[in-house]
UniProtKB/Swiss-Prot annotation:
One of its GO terms (biological process) is DNA-templated transcription. NCBIfam families: PRK04016.1. This is DNA-directed RNA polymerases I, II, and III subunit RPABC5. The lineage of its organism: Eukaryota, Viridiplantae, Streptophyta, Embryophyta, Tracheophyta. Zn(2+) binds at residues 7, 10, 44-45. GO terms for molecular function: DNA binding; DNA-directed RNA polymerase activity; zinc ion binding. It comes from Brassica napus. Pfam families: RNA_pol_N.
Amino acid sequence: MIIPVRCFTCGKVIGNKWDAYLDLLQLDYTEGDALDALNLVRYCCRRMLMTHVDLIEKLLNYNTLEKSDNS
């Protein structure tokens, strides 16, 4: 879905780091090196970025307001 704005455990703002994290991964940084470059040292904040699954683009393909032809 959408990256949470704050870490669930400690409350640190992490939502603004998602795009930078993806950019660093595109530059062939490892996950750990990218998180270190973003100054995310707490393991709770690190897991928020590492385990996030970005599904928003896939969900936007489904329009729940459209009626199907089968009804």
